[in-house]
UniProtKB/Swiss-Prot annotation:
Plays a role in distal tail tip complex assembly. The tail tip complex is assembled successively with three tail tip proteins J, one tail tip protein I, one tail tip protein L and one tail tip protein K. The tail tip complex interacts with tail measure protein to initiate tail tube assembly. The formation of the tail tip complex is completed by the addition of tail tip protein M, which is followed by tail tube polymerization. May be excluded form tail tip during maturation and would be absent from virions. It comes from Escherichia phage lambda (Bacteriophage lambda). It is found in: Host cytoplasm. GO terms for biological process: viral tail assembly. The gene is I. This is Tail tip assembly protein I. Keywords: Host cytoplasm, Late protein, Viral release from host cell, Viral tail assembly.
Amino acid sequence: MAATHTLPLASPGMARICLYGDLQRFGRRIDLRVKTGAEAIRALATQLPAFRQKLSDGWYQVRIAGRDVSTSGLTAQLHETLPDGAVIHIVPRVAGAKSGGVFQIVLGAAAIAGSFFTAGATLAAWGAAIGAGGMTGILFSLGASMVLGGVAQMLAPKARTPRIQTTDNGKQNTYFSSLDNMVAQGNVLPVLYGEMRVGSRVVSQEISTADEGDGGQVVVIGR
C-alpha cells in the first residue's frame, strides 16, 4: 500500500494593516500573509525599526477584525487566529483618552511587547504546554510575570537623582548670596585650603528673628 509523504502546508490568509496619523509615513495600507495580529505587528517592527520606535512612544487604538483591543486582553487578542481578509487598524490617540470610554486604547510599547511575547507560538500551544503538568504551568506563570514585570519596569519613569544646583523643591540654592551655596543631601562636599574664590557649600543653617518689642524674644523661623 503506497503511503503519501506530504505535509500540510496551508499558508495563512492575507491580512491588511491600515495605519493612520503619523504612522502613515510607513505606508497607509500594508498587506501581509500572517496568522495573527501579533505576527503583523512583529513583521512591521522587525522590518521597520523606525516604526517600532514610533509605536513605542504613544497610545493607540488597535482594532483587529472589527474588535478593539483592550489593555487587559492585549496579549490574548494579539495572538488570536485571524480570519482570511482581516483588517487591522492602528490609530494614534492622545494619552488622556484612555480614561474616556468610547474606545479602548493601549500603550504602543505594550503592543510591541505583546507581539514578541510568545515568539511566534500560538495560544493553543501554550495551553497544551500548561495542561501537560502542574510544574509546567508554574514555570509558565513565573516566566510571564518576569516578562510583563520587565515591560512595566521599562515603562516606569526613572527617579531623578539630586543635583548640586537644586534643592528638593526644585529652586536654586541661593540662601546667602547670588552664588549657589547649598548642596542637596548625599552630594560630595569639597574640602578647600587657603583663600576661596568660589561659592561656599553650607552644611547647616539656622535663620532666626528677634522681636525687639517683646523683650528681645528670639523666634526661630527656619533651620
